[in-house]
Amino acid sequence: MLLANNSTYPVGLDISDLSIKLVQLNKIRGKIKVQALGKLTLPPGIITNGAINDRAELIKAIKKIIAAPGYGKVSSEEAAVCLPESKTFIKRIEVAKSPNSLADVIGAEIEKHVPMSKSEIYYDWQVTAELADKYQVLIGAAPKEIVDQYAQLLDDAKLSVAAMEIEPTAICRGLLKEEAPEAKPAAAPLKPEGTAPLNYGIIDIGANHTCLIFYSDNTIVFSVSMPISGEEITAKISRTLDLTPEQAEKAKIICGLDETKANGVIKKILEETIKNLISKIKEALDFYENYYGGKLNKILLCGGGGNITELGKIIAQEFSIKVETADALTNLDETGEKFNPIFMEKHSFDAKLLKNDSSREGNNLSIQQNSGSTFTTAIGLALRGIFIDEL
């Protein structure tokens, strides 16, 4: 028997190479609450760079987390799923007004903005602002092969598709108050030229890629993938210090870029990688400022790599921009304490493995880490149905 307050909103499923994260939300007396939340680690090789290698095992994993999410109980057979960010494209463009329909103009110009032929992609668009002589339009596109693969996956898992989204869309919805319906302007009103936007950069450092999203004036401007990942950082530590991947992961989390931890051994190993990340951010930031104008007001860090100790401080110093760790519960009426059994992770590491017996902390290093920001995409997907209802 279903409880009276069981949610009918779709489940948000964030399926990545290494895990599945699930969130279902409900609206109770005007408050957005978590109905179900959970995480399931995937064995290596089931998914590689977003491509599904072992469909049968992935279907089993989806069914498992649906049946037992960890917190709460799933009460919907609909799901909103995120398409692999590295396989998709999203960008704000400007389209001059003309006698032709906007749909026809965008269809004719889509290949100028997406590095694939029109016949190979599904694409969608929405007007984000109307100016005197042009429209600002957000376009998104994904390869048909990937979309069809994920649609079939959900069908095989006995779930109906509520939505398939490009990851930056879900991330922004999960993190920014500007994405809530009450913050949105009425359907693309005429906007005076020169209106000052509120500009964000969002850096999502995931297990197998990093994504930098630029967000201005209540809409995504563009996103860029970077060839840096949490796994790459862990592997570099493992190779350099001859540690197991598990030991290297703990060293990364506990020591990070803090030069006072283990005498800065891990920071030294990561310096070249972080320089590369800073360089890529600078390239994207220069493009944003030169092509779109404006300056970033704030950078938000999310994803597992966003918790690397001292990373935010280094980025803030490099670009003189305020940097914060993202709060994935921003648009929910929840506090994080009730999810601590899932969010909070304790990591311990023996500094002797670093041949660093002189560490001031002693040999045993440990840290309590909140992994809540890794649920950003799943929360953003789950918010979609609620926000649509509120429009």
Task: List PLM regions with ranges.
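Hydrophobic/aromatic-enriched cytosolic interaction surfaces used to assemble or bind macromolecules
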Residues: 1-391
